[in-house]
Amino acid sequence: MSGHSKWATTKHKKAIIDARRGKNFAKLIKNIEVAARTGGGDPGGNPTLYDAIQKAKKSSVPNDNIERARKRGAGEEAGGADWQTITYEGYGPNGVAVLIECLTDNRNRAAGEVRVAMTRNGGNMADPGSVSYLFSRKGVITLEKNGLSEDDVLMAVLEAGAEEVTDLGDSFEIISEPTDLVAVRTALQDAGIDYDSADASFQPSVTVPLDAEGARKVMKLVDALEDSDDVQDVYTNADIPDEILAQLEE
């Protein structure tokens, strides 16, 4: 199992916990609003909006909240904010590369919160381009196994452009080019296979192996960054062994 897959497992489990507590709702709502503003308010003609809505539904965001966000983004209802996407780069403990994607209506606030979280948790900000070259943009789909084998999933998505199917233990992760994400997701639907999320995500080309102490420090940094309302996603190239993940999750 590669480093990014292990980290995806950690993020996936954390996302489920956060959703149950309602912590993720605001970020999911922002994604819907921005997707509707960028590509129109019809999910049928806007794949990014469709995926944002599906992800929100999977996380139990109330339908009324989803619909209001869609309308705000599409201009059908007043109250939409002027969201801006900003990416910050840095290094965490043990030299782990960190990409931080923000969606904010206040650049100064976002920059300040990211900087504080980094410096208080063993991280350092880096110049643009000094970290991002270690990552590539990929389409990432996660789905629960539900009795499916890796071959079942691979057969459904291979011709649609899937590059890799990885077994994450309780779930599968499908990697594709971002441009093939909709085709792969549609192939799953055509095969009657349900999925949890479909996103364009950063995947590391080189990973940094961590021991238990290093993993604990990096996860503390990621938690601090994700506590900011302006931070949408945090990506690292940490490679955390399964046994250490199990210790940290106890």
Swiss-Prot record:
GO terms for cellular component: cytosol. It is found in: Cytoplasm. One of its GO terms (molecular function) is DNA binding. InterPro entries: Integrase-like_N, TACO1_YebC-like_2nd/3rd_dom, TACO1_YebC_N, Transcrip_reg_TACO1-like, Transcrip_reg_TACO1-like_dom3, YebC-like. It comes from the Bacteria. GO terms for biological process: regulation of DNA-templated transcription. It holds the Pfam family Transcrip_reg. Keywords: Cytoplasm, DNA-binding, Transcription, Transcription regulation. Belongs to the TACO1 family. NCBIfam families: PRK00110.1, PRK12378.1, YebC/PmpR family DNA-binding transcriptional regulator. This is Probable transcriptional regulatory protein Mkms_2298. It comes from Mycobacterium sp. (strain KMS). The lineage of its organism: Bacteria, Bacillati, Actinomycetota, Actinomycetes, Mycobacteriales.
